Amino acid sequence: MEAKVEKIETNVVKLEIKVEAEKFDAALTKAYNKNKGKYNVPGFRKGKVPMAILKKMYGIEIFYDDAVNIAIDESYNEALKAEDIRPVDYPKVDIVEIGEGKELVYTATVTTYPEVEIGEYKGLDIKKPSYEVSEEEVEKQVKEMQSKNARVETKEEGTIADGNIAIIDFKGFVDGEAFEGGEGTDYPLEIGSGTFIDNFEEQLVGLAIGDKKEVNVTFPENYGKEELNAKPAMFEVTVKGIKVKELPELDDEFAKEVSEFDTLAELKENVKKRLEESNNERAEREFEEAVITSIIETSKIDLPEVMLTKEIDSMMKDLESRLQYQGLSLDQYMEFTGNTIEKMREFMKENAERKVKADIILEAVAKAEEVKATDEQLNERALELGRMYGPKDPKKMANILLKAQKAMIEKDIIIENTLKLIKESCK
Protein backbone atom coordinates (compact mmCIF):
# COMPACT_ATOMS: atom_id res chain seq x y z
CA MET A 1 0.00 0.00 0.00
CA GLU A 2 1.23 3.46 -0.94
CA ALA A 3 -0.44 6.72 0.07
CA LYS A 4 0.00 10.38 -0.82
CA VAL A 5 -1.73 13.18 1.09
CA GLU A 6 -2.92 16.48 -0.34
CA LYS A 7 -4.45 19.18 1.87
CA ILE A 8 -7.59 20.43 0.11
CA GLU A 9 -8.73 23.01 2.65
CA THR A 10 -8.82 23.51 6.42
CA ASN A 11 -9.55 20.14 8.05
CA VAL A 12 -9.99 18.38 4.67
CA VAL A 13 -7.40 16.13 2.99
CA LYS A 14 -7.36 13.93 -0.09
CA LEU A 15 -5.45 10.67 0.07
CA GLU A 16 -4.38 8.93 -3.12
CA ILE A 17 -3.97 5.29 -2.17
CA LYS A 18 -2.42 2.57 -4.31
CA VAL A 19 -3.16 -1.07 -3.54
CA GLU A 20 -0.65 -3.54 -4.99
CA ALA A 21 -1.88 -5.68 -7.91
CA GLU A 22 -1.40 -8.89 -5.89
CA LYS A 23 -3.56 -7.55 -3.05
CA PHE A 24 -6.31 -6.38 -5.39
CA ASP A 25 -6.30 -9.77 -7.15
CA ALA A 26 -6.65 -11.37 -3.70
CA ALA A 27 -9.61 -9.06 -3.06
CA LEU A 28 -11.15 -10.18 -6.37
CA THR A 29 -10.79 -13.80 -5.24
CA LYS A 30 -12.51 -12.96 -1.94
CA ALA A 31 -15.29 -11.25 -3.89
CA TYR A 32 -15.67 -14.35 -6.08
CA ASN A 33 -15.89 -16.62 -3.02
CA LYS A 34 -18.52 -14.32 -1.52
CA ASN A 35 -20.70 -14.27 -4.65
CA LYS A 36 -20.16 -17.59 -6.46
CA GLY A 37 -23.27 -19.12 -4.89
CA LYS A 38 -25.47 -16.62 -6.73
CA TYR A 39 -24.75 -18.02 -10.19
CA ASN A 40 -26.30 -21.05 -11.92
CA VAL A 41 -24.25 -22.46 -14.80
CA PRO A 42 -25.26 -25.71 -16.57
CA GLY A 43 -22.83 -28.50 -15.80
CA PHE A 44 -21.78 -27.08 -12.45
CA ARG A 45 -23.30 -27.41 -9.00
CA LYS A 46 -24.44 -24.12 -7.49
CA GLY A 47 -21.49 -22.39 -5.82
CA LYS A 48 -18.97 -24.60 -7.61
CA VAL A 49 -18.57 -22.61 -10.83
CA PRO A 50 -14.86 -21.80 -11.30
CA MET A 51 -13.89 -18.14 -11.27
CA ALA A 52 -12.47 -18.39 -14.80
CA ILE A 53 -15.86 -19.58 -16.17
CA LEU A 54 -17.74 -16.72 -14.48
CA LYS A 55 -15.18 -14.21 -15.78
CA LYS A 56 -15.64 -15.54 -19.32
CA MET A 57 -19.43 -15.49 -19.11
CA TYR A 58 -20.02 -12.21 -17.26
CA GLY A 59 -16.69 -10.38 -17.14
CA ILE A 60 -14.42 -9.78 -14.17
CA GLU A 61 -16.29 -6.51 -13.55
CA ILE A 62 -19.07 -8.40 -11.73
CA PHE A 63 -16.69 -8.72 -8.77
CA TYR A 64 -15.38 -5.15 -8.78
CA ASP A 65 -17.80 -3.60 -6.27
CA ASP A 66 -17.14 -6.17 -3.55
CA ALA A 67 -13.42 -6.36 -4.35
CA VAL A 68 -13.08 -2.58 -4.10
CA ASN A 69 -14.88 -2.57 -0.73
CA ILE A 70 -12.61 -5.35 0.54
CA ALA A 71 -9.45 -3.60 -0.70
CA ILE A 72 -10.51 -0.24 0.74
CA ASP A 73 -11.40 -1.80 4.10
CA GLU A 74 -7.90 -3.24 4.28
CA SER A 75 -5.94 -0.24 2.93
CA TYR A 76 -7.80 2.91 4.05
CA ASN A 77 -7.24 2.48 7.81
CA GLU A 78 -3.64 1.44 7.13
CA ALA A 79 -3.13 4.70 5.20
CA LEU A 80 -4.73 6.78 7.95
CA LYS A 81 -2.43 5.23 10.52
CA ALA A 82 0.67 5.63 8.34
CA GLU A 83 -0.08 9.32 7.67
CA ASP A 84 -1.31 10.03 11.23
CA ILE A 85 -4.71 11.24 10.01
CA ARG A 86 -7.71 11.28 12.34
CA PRO A 87 -10.97 11.37 10.35
CA VAL A 88 -14.24 12.68 11.75
CA ASP A 89 -16.50 11.39 8.98
CA TYR A 90 -16.72 8.75 6.26
CA PRO A 91 -14.55 9.44 3.21
CA LYS A 92 -15.73 10.29 -0.30
CA VAL A 93 -14.09 7.63 -2.46
CA ASP A 94 -13.34 7.90 -6.19
CA ILE A 95 -11.76 5.09 -8.21
CA VAL A 96 -8.86 6.26 -10.39
CA GLU A 97 -7.55 2.95 -11.83
CA ILE A 98 -8.90 -0.57 -11.59
CA GLY A 99 -8.31 -3.88 -13.34
CA GLU A 100 -7.35 -7.50 -12.82
CA GLY A 101 -3.60 -7.84 -12.52
CA LYS A 102 -3.27 -4.10 -11.96
CA GLU A 103 -2.91 -1.76 -9.02
CA LEU A 104 -6.12 -0.40 -7.56
CA VAL A 105 -5.75 3.37 -7.32
CA TYR A 106 -8.37 5.41 -5.51
CA THR A 107 -8.73 8.74 -3.76
CA ALA A 108 -10.39 9.26 -0.38
CA THR A 109 -11.39 12.80 0.54
CA VAL A 110 -12.05 13.09 4.24
CA THR A 111 -12.70 15.68 6.94
CA THR A 112 -10.06 15.50 9.66
CA TYR A 113 -10.00 16.20 13.37
CA PRO A 114 -9.20 19.91 13.75
CA GLU A 115 -5.92 21.29 14.97
CA VAL A 116 -6.21 23.53 18.00
CA GLU A 117 -4.05 26.35 19.28
CA ILE A 118 -4.55 26.09 23.03
CA GLY A 119 -5.14 29.38 24.82
CA GLU A 120 -4.48 30.23 28.46
CA TYR A 121 -5.55 27.51 30.85
CA LYS A 122 -3.12 27.71 33.78
CA GLY A 123 -3.66 30.13 36.66
CA LEU A 124 -6.89 31.58 35.31
CA ASP A 125 -8.24 34.49 37.35
CA ILE A 126 -11.59 32.81 38.00
CA LYS A 127 -13.04 32.21 41.44
CA LYS A 128 -15.70 29.72 42.40
CA PRO A 129 -18.82 31.62 43.52
CA SER A 130 -20.29 31.08 46.97
CA TYR A 131 -23.97 31.06 47.87
CA GLU A 132 -25.15 31.23 51.48
CA VAL A 133 -28.45 29.72 52.58
CA SER A 134 -30.70 32.26 54.30
CA GLU A 135 -33.27 31.53 56.99
CA GLU A 136 -35.90 32.84 54.56
CA GLU A 137 -34.99 30.12 52.05
CA VAL A 138 -35.27 27.44 54.73
CA GLU A 139 -38.65 28.78 55.86
CA LYS A 140 -39.87 28.88 52.26
CA GLN A 141 -38.96 25.22 51.75
CA VAL A 142 -40.65 24.19 54.99
CA LYS A 143 -43.78 26.15 54.06
CA GLU A 144 -43.86 24.39 50.68
CA MET A 145 -43.79 21.08 52.55
CA GLN A 146 -46.58 22.40 54.75
CA SER A 147 -48.64 23.36 51.69
CA LYS A 148 -48.14 19.96 50.03
CA ASN A 149 -49.40 18.24 53.19
CA ALA A 150 -52.44 20.48 53.64
CA ARG A 151 -55.98 19.12 53.92
CA VAL A 152 -58.29 20.43 51.22
CA GLU A 153 -61.89 21.19 52.19
CA THR A 154 -64.80 22.43 50.11
CA LYS A 155 -65.85 26.02 50.67
CA GLU A 156 -69.66 26.00 50.54
CA GLU A 157 -70.14 29.76 50.81
CA GLY A 158 -68.22 32.94 50.16
CA THR A 159 -65.89 33.98 47.37
CA ILE A 160 -62.49 33.05 45.97
CA ALA A 161 -59.57 34.37 48.02
CA ASP A 162 -55.82 34.23 47.56
CA GLY A 163 -54.58 30.71 48.36
CA ASN A 164 -57.95 29.09 47.59
CA ILE A 165 -58.33 26.45 44.90
CA ALA A 166 -60.88 27.52 42.30
CA ILE A 167 -62.55 24.73 40.30
CA ILE A 168 -63.20 26.29 36.91
CA ASP A 169 -64.26 25.67 33.34
CA PHE A 170 -62.47 27.93 30.87
CA LYS A 171 -62.23 28.53 27.15
CA GLY A 172 -59.71 30.87 25.54
CA PHE A 173 -60.03 33.04 22.45
CA VAL A 174 -57.45 34.94 20.41
CA ASP A 175 -58.69 37.37 17.77
CA GLY A 176 -62.17 36.07 18.48
CA GLU A 177 -61.26 32.46 17.65
CA ALA A 178 -60.90 29.56 20.11
CA PHE A 179 -57.36 28.18 20.09
CA GLU A 180 -56.02 24.67 20.57
CA GLY A 181 -55.14 23.81 24.17
CA GLY A 182 -57.02 26.81 25.56
CA GLU A 183 -59.93 24.90 27.08
CA GLY A 184 -60.40 23.03 30.36
CA THR A 185 -63.16 21.51 32.49
CA ASP A 186 -63.21 21.22 36.29
CA TYR A 187 -59.66 22.54 36.41
CA PRO A 188 -58.29 23.04 39.97
CA LEU A 189 -56.42 26.36 39.92
CA GLU A 190 -54.64 27.49 43.09
CA ILE A 191 -54.90 31.26 43.29
CA GLY A 192 -51.47 32.83 43.71
CA SER A 193 -49.59 29.79 42.42
CA GLY A 194 -48.61 31.51 39.16
CA THR A 195 -49.76 28.45 37.21
CA PHE A 196 -51.65 30.42 34.59
CA ILE A 197 -50.73 33.49 32.53
CA ASP A 198 -49.88 36.66 34.47
CA ASN A 199 -52.95 38.48 35.81
CA PHE A 200 -55.30 35.53 35.16
CA GLU A 201 -55.58 34.25 38.72
CA GLU A 202 -55.94 37.70 40.28
CA GLN A 203 -59.08 38.36 38.21
CA LEU A 204 -60.84 35.39 39.82
CA VAL A 205 -60.51 36.76 43.37
CA GLY A 206 -63.93 37.75 44.72
CA LEU A 207 -65.95 35.47 42.42
CA ALA A 208 -68.49 33.05 43.91
CA ILE A 209 -69.62 29.59 42.81
CA GLY A 210 -71.71 29.93 39.64
CA ASP A 211 -70.18 33.25 38.62
CA LYS A 212 -69.03 33.73 35.03
CA LYS A 213 -66.38 36.18 33.94
CA GLU A 214 -64.42 37.22 30.87
CA VAL A 215 -60.76 37.26 31.88
CA ASN A 216 -58.49 39.37 29.68
CA VAL A 217 -54.76 38.63 29.59
CA THR A 218 -51.77 38.87 27.25
CA PHE A 219 -49.56 35.90 26.45
CA PRO A 220 -45.85 36.47 27.16
CA GLU A 221 -43.54 37.09 24.20
CA ASN A 222 -41.73 33.79 24.71
CA TYR A 223 -44.81 31.68 25.51
CA GLY A 224 -43.59 28.83 23.31
CA LYS A 225 -46.33 28.78 20.67
CA GLU A 226 -45.57 31.21 17.88
CA GLU A 227 -49.23 31.88 17.12
CA LEU A 228 -49.84 32.92 20.76
CA ASN A 229 -46.63 34.82 21.58
CA ALA A 230 -47.45 38.35 22.88
CA LYS A 231 -51.10 37.95 21.80
CA PRO A 232 -53.99 39.42 23.83
CA ALA A 233 -56.51 36.74 24.79
CA MET A 234 -59.92 36.48 26.40
CA PHE A 235 -60.98 33.52 28.53
CA GLU A 236 -64.59 32.69 29.34
CA VAL A 237 -64.45 31.38 32.92
CA THR A 238 -67.14 29.68 35.01
CA VAL A 239 -66.54 29.07 38.73
CA LYS A 240 -67.83 25.59 39.65
CA GLY A 241 -66.36 25.21 43.11
CA ILE A 242 -64.04 26.65 45.74
CA LYS A 243 -61.72 24.69 48.00
CA VAL A 244 -59.69 25.84 50.98
CA LYS A 245 -56.36 24.49 52.15
CA GLU A 246 -56.17 23.65 55.86
CA LEU A 247 -52.47 23.88 56.68
CA PRO A 248 -51.02 21.61 59.37
CA GLU A 249 -49.27 23.20 62.35
CA LEU A 250 -45.52 23.55 61.91
CA ASP A 251 -44.37 21.63 64.96
CA ASP A 252 -42.55 18.45 65.95
CA GLU A 253 -45.57 16.31 65.02
CA PHE A 254 -45.47 17.75 61.51
CA ALA A 255 -41.77 16.89 61.25
CA LYS A 256 -42.47 13.29 62.29
CA GLU A 257 -45.27 12.94 59.72
CA VAL A 258 -43.38 14.28 56.71
CA SER A 259 -39.82 13.11 57.42
CA GLU A 260 -37.61 10.74 59.40
CA PHE A 261 -36.87 13.48 61.94
CA ASP A 262 -38.37 13.80 65.42
CA THR A 263 -38.32 17.58 65.73
CA LEU A 264 -39.04 20.59 63.55
CA ALA A 265 -35.56 21.91 64.33
CA GLU A 266 -33.96 18.74 62.94
CA LEU A 267 -36.15 18.95 59.84
CA LYS A 268 -35.11 22.56 59.24
CA GLU A 269 -31.45 21.65 59.73
CA ASN A 270 -31.82 18.93 57.08
CA VAL A 271 -33.56 21.35 54.71
CA LYS A 272 -30.68 23.80 55.19
CA LYS A 273 -28.15 21.05 54.50
CA ARG A 274 -29.89 20.07 51.25
CA LEU A 275 -30.07 23.71 50.16
CA GLU A 276 -26.34 24.09 50.88
CA GLU A 277 -25.60 21.01 48.77
CA SER A 278 -27.74 22.42 45.97
CA ASN A 279 -25.95 25.77 46.21
CA ASN A 280 -22.56 24.05 46.11
CA GLU A 281 -23.58 22.13 42.98
CA ARG A 282 -24.78 25.38 41.39
CA ALA A 283 -21.52 27.14 42.29
CA GLU A 284 -19.48 24.26 40.87
CA ARG A 285 -21.48 24.33 37.61
CA GLU A 286 -21.04 28.09 37.24
CA PHE A 287 -17.32 27.84 38.05
CA GLU A 288 -16.89 25.11 35.47
CA GLU A 289 -18.85 27.04 32.83
CA ALA A 290 -16.72 30.15 33.45
CA VAL A 291 -13.52 28.10 33.03
CA ILE A 292 -14.79 26.51 29.81
CA THR A 293 -15.85 29.90 28.44
CA SER A 294 -12.38 31.29 29.17
CA ILE A 295 -10.43 28.51 27.47
CA ILE A 296 -12.73 28.58 24.42
CA GLU A 297 -12.34 32.35 24.06
CA THR A 298 -8.53 32.23 24.20
CA SER A 299 -8.04 29.13 22.04
CA LYS A 300 -8.09 29.01 18.24
CA ILE A 301 -9.94 26.24 16.46
CA ASP A 302 -11.68 25.80 13.10
CA LEU A 303 -14.58 23.47 13.81
CA PRO A 304 -15.57 21.16 10.92
CA GLU A 305 -19.26 21.50 10.14
CA VAL A 306 -19.69 17.72 10.20
CA MET A 307 -18.66 17.59 13.89
CA LEU A 308 -21.25 20.22 14.74
CA THR A 309 -23.92 18.37 12.77
CA LYS A 310 -23.10 15.09 14.53
CA GLU A 311 -23.34 16.73 17.96
CA ILE A 312 -26.73 18.26 17.11
CA ASP A 313 -27.84 14.82 15.86
CA SER A 314 -26.80 13.36 19.21
CA MET A 315 -28.65 16.09 21.14
CA MET A 316 -31.80 15.46 19.08
CA LYS A 317 -31.59 11.73 19.83
CA ASP A 318 -31.22 12.46 23.55
CA LEU A 319 -34.28 14.73 23.41
CA GLU A 320 -36.28 12.07 21.59
CA SER A 321 -35.29 9.43 24.17
CA ARG A 322 -36.33 11.69 27.08
CA LEU A 323 -39.65 12.42 25.38
CA GLN A 324 -40.31 8.71 24.77
CA TYR A 325 -39.68 8.06 28.47
CA GLN A 326 -42.44 10.62 29.18
CA GLY A 327 -44.78 9.01 26.64
CA LEU A 328 -44.37 11.69 23.97
CA SER A 329 -43.16 11.51 20.39
CA LEU A 330 -40.90 14.15 18.87
CA ASP A 331 -43.73 15.21 16.54
CA GLN A 332 -46.11 15.68 19.49
CA TYR A 333 -43.53 17.76 21.33
CA MET A 334 -43.02 19.97 18.27
CA GLU A 335 -46.77 20.45 17.98
CA PHE A 336 -47.19 21.32 21.69
CA THR A 337 -44.32 23.82 21.67
CA GLY A 338 -45.02 25.30 18.24
CA ASN A 339 -41.52 24.33 17.10
CA THR A 340 -40.10 22.57 14.06
CA ILE A 341 -37.15 20.18 13.75
CA GLU A 342 -35.24 22.89 11.87
CA LYS A 343 -35.89 25.50 14.59
CA MET A 344 -34.95 23.04 17.34
CA ARG A 345 -31.68 22.15 15.59
CA GLU A 346 -30.88 25.85 15.16
CA PHE A 347 -31.69 26.43 18.85
CA MET A 348 -29.26 23.62 19.81
CA LYS A 349 -26.47 24.89 17.56
CA GLU A 350 -24.80 27.27 20.03
CA ASN A 351 -24.64 24.71 22.86
CA ALA A 352 -23.49 22.00 20.45
CA GLU A 353 -20.65 24.18 19.16
CA ARG A 354 -19.60 25.06 22.71
CA LYS A 355 -19.54 21.40 23.78
CA VAL A 356 -17.56 20.17 20.78
CA LYS A 357 -15.02 22.99 21.08
CA ALA A 358 -14.63 22.40 24.82
CA ASP A 359 -14.06 18.66 24.30
CA ILE A 360 -11.45 19.26 21.58
CA ILE A 361 -9.58 21.88 23.61
CA LEU A 362 -9.68 19.84 26.83
CA GLU A 363 -8.42 16.80 24.93
CA ALA A 364 -5.50 18.89 23.64
CA VAL A 365 -4.75 20.12 27.18
CA ALA A 366 -4.92 16.53 28.45
CA LYS A 367 -2.36 15.50 25.85
CA ALA A 368 -0.09 18.43 26.71
CA GLU A 369 -0.32 17.72 30.46
CA GLU A 370 -0.26 13.92 30.06
CA VAL A 371 -3.53 13.53 31.97
CA LYS A 372 -4.60 9.89 32.38
CA ALA A 373 -7.52 7.90 33.73
CA THR A 374 -6.54 5.49 36.51
CA ASP A 375 -7.68 1.87 36.60
CA GLU A 376 -9.55 2.69 39.81
CA GLN A 377 -11.45 5.51 38.08
CA LEU A 378 -12.27 3.28 35.11
CA ASN A 379 -13.59 0.48 37.30
CA GLU A 380 -15.55 2.88 39.49
CA ARG A 381 -17.18 4.60 36.50
CA ALA A 382 -17.98 1.29 34.83
CA LEU A 383 -19.65 0.11 38.05
CA GLU A 384 -21.70 3.33 38.23
CA LEU A 385 -22.88 2.72 34.67
CA GLY A 386 -23.43 -0.94 35.50
CA ARG A 387 -25.81 0.02 38.32
CA MET A 388 -27.67 2.26 35.88
CA TYR A 389 -27.96 -0.13 32.91
CA GLY A 390 -27.81 -3.51 34.62
CA PRO A 391 -29.20 -3.16 38.16
CA LYS A 392 -29.72 -6.92 38.51
CA ASP A 393 -26.01 -7.64 38.07
CA PRO A 394 -24.03 -4.36 38.07
CA LYS A 395 -20.60 -6.05 38.13
CA LYS A 396 -21.39 -8.16 35.08
CA MET A 397 -22.68 -5.12 33.20
CA ALA A 398 -19.60 -3.13 34.27
CA ASN A 399 -17.33 -5.79 32.75
CA ILE A 400 -19.35 -5.76 29.52
CA LEU A 401 -19.12 -1.96 29.32
CA LEU A 402 -15.37 -2.00 29.98
CA LYS A 403 -14.89 -4.36 27.06
CA ALA A 404 -17.29 -2.63 24.66
CA GLN A 405 -16.90 1.05 25.58
CA LYS A 406 -13.61 1.37 27.45
CA ALA A 407 -12.20 4.05 25.11
CA MET A 408 -15.30 6.24 25.48
CA ILE A 409 -15.40 5.84 29.28
CA GLU A 410 -11.68 6.57 29.49
CA LYS A 411 -12.06 9.70 27.34
CA ASP A 412 -14.85 11.05 29.58
CA ILE A 413 -12.73 10.54 32.71
CA ILE A 414 -9.67 12.18 31.12
CA ILE A 415 -11.77 15.22 30.15
CA GLU A 416 -13.09 15.44 33.74
CA ASN A 417 -9.58 15.08 35.19
CA THR A 418 -8.30 17.78 32.84
CA LEU A 419 -11.06 20.17 33.81
CA LYS A 420 -10.29 19.48 37.47
CA LEU A 421 -6.60 20.25 36.84
CA ILE A 422 -7.49 23.60 35.25
CA LYS A 423 -9.93 24.52 38.04
CA GLU A 424 -7.40 23.69 40.75
CA SER A 425 -4.88 26.04 39.13
CA CYS A 426 -7.31 28.99 39.10
CA LYS A 427 -6.30 31.96 41.24
Curated annotation (Swiss-Prot):
One of its GO terms (molecular function) is protein folding chaperone. It is found in: Cytoplasm. The keyword Cell division applies. Residues 163-248 form the PPIase FKBP-type domain. Coiled coil: none annotated. GO terms for cellular component: cytoplasm. Its main location: cytoplasm. Its EC number is 5.2.1.8. Keywords: Cell cycle, Cell division, Chaperone, Cytoplasm, Isomerase, Rotamase. Gene3D superfamilies: 3.10.50.40, Trigger factor ribosome-binding domain (3.30.70.1050), Trigger factor, C-terminal domain (1.10.3120.10). Belongs to the FKBP-type PPIase family. Tig subfamily. PANTHER family: TRIGGER FACTOR CHAPERONE AND PEPTIDYL-PROLYL CIS/TRANS ISOMERASE, TRIGGER FACTOR-LIKE PROTEIN TIG, CHLOROPLASTIC. Consists of 3 domains; the N-terminus binds the ribosome, the middle domain has PPIase activity, while the C-terminus has intrinsic chaperone activity on its own. Involved in protein export. Acts as a chaperone by maintaining the newly synthesized protein in an open conformation. Functions as a peptidyl-prolyl cis-trans isomerase. This is Trigger factor. It comes from Clostridium botulinum (strain Alaska E43 / Type E3). The gene is tig.
